[in-house]
Amino acid sequence: MAITAQMVKELREKTGAGMMDCKKALTETDGNMDKAIDLLREKGIAKAAKKADRIAAEGLTLIKTDGNTGVILEVNSETDFVAKNEGFKELLNDLADHILAEKPESVEAAMGQKMANGSTVEEYITSAVAKIGEKITLRRFAVLTKGDDAAFGAYLHMGGKIGVLTVLNGTTDEETARDIAMHVAAVNPRFISRDQVSEEEANREREILTQQALQEGKPENIVAKMVEGRLNKYFEEICLLDQAFVKNPDEKVKQVVAAKNATVETFVRYEVGEGIEKRQENFAEEVMNQVKK
């Protein structure tokens, strides 16, 4: 497979490795991006790649709760300027109210539903696009439910650039639930606990760590012990309950939750634009385009 400059660029952005190292890794793995990342990590050239990819699109997240139902949603716009527009914020609120009331199963299902104003969600968004003058999309949402003995934790960071909604069972302490949501916003765990990590992922990480240790020239008789220690650190990076609590790093999140006789049922974290590629433009050209207007 031919290795293109764009592939090398993408691998560099994901790993921070040098151009020649990236080209060599892609060549050795026949252009397989995931395998190239693993190969660079095994050689100690690249750090663990988080699958967040580049943050690109603009917009806002919003969270609303009503009794035992909560919704978190993300609506995208083309520019940050529009995301701060009052008309955009009104649309965000209206969509949240509709989803909270009607609980559609998907974005596609929501688009065809009638709103309180008589128009469908799709028609309402199209109307907003005509007024605001930018493409606007309802990207995603999650509707969460809880019992009477549980608490929602809602946290918006930077006015809605990151939104987190948590559910804690066994407590009605919304402040603690919000603290956990704030922690999730800051640290971005992928799982609640270790038992949610697939055996395949754990084994893959163990193999990478083993190769790293061997590359460092460590004796084989201590490699296994080293690998387990490093694997524990890996779990601390990706599992919420194993992490040091952001408000008090001397405590683990699981200790904070246990102190309330509670358990973390679930969490949803949205970061505006994560995984969406933004159109790349030359900055000098962009400035000149603005000057010419």
From Swiss-Prot:
Q: Does the keyword Ubl conjugation apply?
A: no
Q: Which UniProt keywords apply?
A: Cytoplasm, Elongation factor, Protein biosynthesis
Q: Which residues cross the membrane?
A: none
Give the molecular function GO annotations. Answer: translation elongation factor activity
UniProt entry tagged with the keyword Protein biosynthesis: yes
Could you name the Gene Ontology cellular component terms for this entry?
Answer: cytoplasm
Organism domain of life: Bacteria
Where is the protein situated, by its record's location annotation?
Answer: Cytoplasm
Q: What is its main location?
A: cytoplasm
**Family (UniProt):** Belongs to the EF-Ts family.
Its recorded name reads: Elongation factor Ts
Q: Which organism is it from?
A: Bacillus licheniformis (strain ATCC 14580 / DSM 13 / JCM 2505 / CCUG 7422 / NBRC 12200 / NCIMB 9375 / NCTC 10341 / NRRL NRS-1264 / Gibson 46)
Q: Which gene encodes it?
A: tsf
